[in-house]
Amino acid sequence: MTDWIGQFPKELQDRIQAVVSRDASSQQVFIDVINFIEKEESNKRRKLASGLGLAEDSNDAVGSSLDELSPSPTIHPDTIIFEIPQVSFMSPVRKRMNLTFHLIEQNGQGLPVLSIVNPANNSPDISYINLQNAVKLCLILPILGNSTNPLKKGVVTLCCWMHDLYYTDVNVSKDPLILQLNLDAIKKLMIKSEKLPADIENQFDLTNYRNSVILNPIQERIIDYFTRQFKLCGVNLVSYLPSDTIVKNSFIVNQDTAVALSTSGNDSTKPAMVMVECHKGARDGNLILLEQNEHNPAYILFAFRKPTLVYAISRVLSASYTSVTKHTFSLTIIVLNEKDEERSIEFSIIDQAYFQLIDDFIRSHGISDDSFNEDNKEKVVDSKANVVRAAVNGMLGTTTPATTNSRANGDGGDDDDDEEEDGDFEAGNDDDDSDVAEEYDSAAESVEGEGEEEEEEEEEKEEDVEEEDENNTGKERTKHRNGDVFTRSKEE
């Protein structure tokens, strides 16, 4: 009997030997089976490396060779570190899936892996490894419209972006992880799994939180638990949700169209996060401004429609305010993309009530007035440049964001760059028509279902909006004088 049989347990060796002794030709069958299994495992490892956009033998990318990783087609319960079951993903897939941290073996040690898992067969659809180095930004954010409603404040967004260097395969989607969390539904699941005590609601006086937009102590402890579990797996999860027990995060502005929030340990009057409704071309979304913290540099983001944008503030060269009307304005930033090429990005139909929040952020990072450089002089009428600039500054500086709840009201901006494919876009396939699994909880059904229906209605209107915006763009340019512009750029 050859050495190949030695890889099996003793009992199985005896059974194989008994079969081979009765029929010598069966030995080749066993050898063929072993060769087939080894080939399949090798293909799986290559597929994992390709799916992650990594070189198969890249020690720099993952700390050691991916040849030594042997992921299972299903996740064994004993390997699960932490799991949020059946949550609504918006990206990179669009269905209810499990968000699972689990272990796979590498060099005899457990390696943490973040997987998007199909609950129907417990099989990972997408997996991310080397989390400590791969994750660029991981956030929990309020949802505009939910943050003002005490009944919906617990439905929030978790999003996670990977570093561009993590993807070496240009065919691999760079879409971030974006999913909705229903904290009240998760509370029930955590009680059922004994991660929270069954009498947790009796341990706190929740009376004052029922009509409040601040997280109640139970919701805050769920977020704290998530933060600690993510940290255990090498991911720094930062929460921008209002809370007043474990951490002190406070709303400075909380409207249906914008929020601004200060975080624990920082100046309570200075926002650590600003999020406002805007458009990029014909697509609506959120402009998000993040101050530097202990884990991340300052960022400017556009989310949550595809393609999302993520830029460190150090990559922003200048900012211009244009298309100023009574109610709205546009912000155009010049950035350096990953190829160190300058790129212009316009965010339009921003409620002018939030101009000061945005301008304060721009100014605080050394992006100051540069209206009169040679490039921008062409955009203004020379004889009226000073008058226009002063008038725009005066008009936009008179409204305080805390006293307005008006929605953005204006025409669409220039959509020329909306269809461009750019290396710095977190872009991928925009096939969002996959089926959504059944609701797993009645609480999630009543709250999350409402949000999903609204989102589907928005998507059905998107083609009409794009066509309307294309027609309105010409009107907008005729409507606004060329003099209505001023620009900000980096201080020398």
Swiss-Prot record:
Cellular localization per UniProt: Nucleus; Chromosome
Residue ranges with Acidic residues bias: 412-471
Biased composition, class Polar residues, residue ranges: 396-408
InterPro entries: PH-like_dom_sf, RTT106/SPT16-like_middle_dom, RTT106/SSRP1_HistChap/FACT, Rtt106_PH
Pfam families, A to Z: PH_18 (PF18469), Rttp106-like_middle (PF08512)
Residue segments, region Disordered: 392-492
SMART domains (alphabetical): Rtt106
Keywords linked to the UniProt accession: Chaperone, Chromosome, DNA-binding, Nucleus, Transcription, Transcription regulation
Family to which the UniProt record says this protein belongs: Belongs to the RTT106 family.
Protein name as annotated: Histone chaperone RTT106
Organism: Lodderomyces elongisporus (strain ATCC 11503 / CBS 2605 / JCM 1781 / NBRC 1676 / NRRL YB-4239)
Primary gene name: RTT106
